Amino acid sequence: MEKKVIKKKRKKQEKRKKFRKFWKLGIEEFNTQYFSISRDHELVVREGNYQYNIFDLVQKFGSPLEVAFPFIVEKRYLDLVQTFNYHIKDYGYKGRFFYHYPMKVNQNKEVVLPLISEGANLETGSYNELWLVRKLWEQDQFDSRIRVICNGPKTDRYLGLVQELKEKGLSIIPIIEDLNEYEALKKYRGDVGVRVKLDLRVKSRWDKKNDRYGLSADDIYELGRIKNLKLLHYHIGSQTMHKDDIVAAVKKAIGIYIKIKKSNPSLDTLDIGGGLAIPYEKKKHYNPSSVVKSIISVLKKTCDKEGISHPNIICEWGRYMVAPAQITIFKILCEKPIDHGIAKNWYIIDGSFMNDLIDTWAIHQKWHIVPVNNLRNEKLTRVWLAGSSCDSDDRYTAGGSYILLPRLEDLDSSEYQYIALFDSGAYQDSLASHHCLLSSPAKIIAQNGVLTVARRRESPEEVGKMFGW
């Protein structure tokens, strides 16, 4: 009898494992290591010994719903710092590593404060973002050692705030991005950085033939000595798909760095910008540790050969840091047949791709989509998803492929199917809109076993007020 019970238990475990594998859950390489399937066939998220049942959350808070997990951000930050420091020590590299979180990726409090609390530095791209830094600084929410880099067009207000914070004791470095900014910062008494255009084509979401950011290497050489130059910065793109492109950029940048340092001995830091990709589609991808290892190796070998001291390293990998720390939940309202197409039906969701996940429309972003309930249903159907706005572009077709989801005909009459879209923590919140006056999703934060409402569901009156009604 006992053997039968054990055998039955093993069968259940094997079946659960099979479905986890099918939905690509519990896999660190895909950033789904915290996600699993409950005994009731529902999506769960595990934070140590805490567990969040996503189906229960959507029953309690309704849909559409965003669920943010600050603990994932904290863990990713600590892992990245540990990875850099490990390879720095392993190679005998003499420079230090600093992570600067680019606030534009996600300015929400539940993201920024956990990163700061773990020791992350910041990068701002506008006066308003730096104003928020000032507010936190005045509230004594910063360690005095925090460092801030300022990118973006430097308006007079922006530069004035940089000067004010520098005088108050904040370690702050404005980045020169054009010759006008070079002139404007001549009287600035603090450290400065300069952004270089690498003139390097890579496969990424942001690889443009004409780059409007930064100065050419020749322009920087012609400037000669730049007062208090501390940092050389570049940015090759977003979602850089090949490791070799990241390494090629480092090789080119360190060559430029060495030339500039000859006339600027104060230069001691290389900021490699952002661009580290994440596996949105949950396919095999380069390993971040191998990227870091190659970066350290290239910098050390090149500097040792040229007799130059190893520069400190800054990276601004924002999407990599925060995208996996949020999921977006929708309810399937109904289905409609597709007459001609690889998918069989449209599933109509109770939210909007154009409003809530705008990269679906803007850059044809692909998402990993998993059922919230009925995760062990073996009968699945090929579908496309349509948003609730009246716009024909409000849809998701997986790049011309299809999404596999449970069949609605198999549900109980009173049951709804819910779906989770992974990796929605980068850019989507700040770019969101209210097309067709649709309300934004409600948002909750799950941390340390506690649920906090970060944004309650908007009423029609509240949405109308945004448009003057």
What is the predicted function of each stretch?
Residues 72, 106, 129, 155, ...:
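Short, glycine-/Ser/Thr-/acidic-enriched flexible segments
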Residues 253, 291-303:
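Alpha-helix-loop-beta-strand connector modules within alpha/beta enzyme cores
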Residues 202, 268-283, 314-326, 356:
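Flexible glycine/acidic-rich beta-alpha junction loops that bind and position SAM and/or redox cofactors
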Residues 304, 308-469:
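Charged (often Lys/Glu-rich) extended helix/loop segments that serve as interaction or gating elements
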Residues 242-248, 279-291, 322-334, 400, ...:
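Short glycine/threonine-rich loop-to-helix capping motif typified by GTGT followed
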Residues 92-269, 276-278, 298:
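Active-site-proximal beta-alpha core segment in soluble small-molecule metabolic enzymes
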Residues 67-70, 237, 241, 280-283:
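Glycine-rich, proline-tolerant flexible connector loops at the mouths of alpha/beta enzymes
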Residues 2-156, 400-422, 426-429, 434-436, ...:
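N-terminal capping/small domains of soluble enzymes
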